[in-house]
């Protein structure tokens, strides 16, 4: 499991008690305190209501600051997702280019295999004339060329296998990122549904 970022820790702490669920109650309490302060019959009662108003205002300011902070973190998170999406698009484009290159290498390997078969057939024909000096020289040259082509074929096959493995890793990474994005979207929908439900519930 990866290290938890500071933004994730702050976000969890800010959301642990809901998201603005008590704002309406605080505002109602502030209005009631203001009315009582206006109608206070003594200095002590007025001072008490004044302190309550200050406390309620402080809570409202804190709630507003918390909401703004969560909103700012959500914006940064969306920017990060957009960046990841662009990186995925670039990776996919690069993968298509690698696939095209691998196809070219496969065609080259097929040509090498065909040439090798032709050289093998020619070598068998040459073997019927072992006494001719020039024929032996040609056979030796063909053997060297065949060995060289075999090395090329092995190199191409190794590169092709490496590209296949790299492409498999890339596809796995893309799939994991897509799953992460889908899970985040589902979580966001659940949170929005909960917020909507809390807003529609009657206040005690």
From Swiss-Prot:
Region (Interaction with NIF3L1): 105-204
Predominant cellular place of this UniProt entry's protein: cytoplasm
A single GO cellular-component term on record: cytoplasm
Regions annotated as coiled coil: 146-204
Annotated compartments: Cytoplasm; Nucleus; Nucleus speckle
The keyword Transmembrane helix is annotated on this UniProt entry: no
Residue ranges, annotated region (Disordered): 182-204
N-acetylglycine, modified sites: 2
GO molecular function: RNA binding
GO process terms (BP): mRNA export from nucleus; mRNA processing; RNA splicing
Superkingdom of the source species: Eukaryota
Residue(s) carrying Phosphothreonine: 5
Name of the protein described by the UniProt record: THO complex subunit 7
Native species: Homo sapiens
Segments of this protein annotated with the region Interaction with THOC5: 50-137
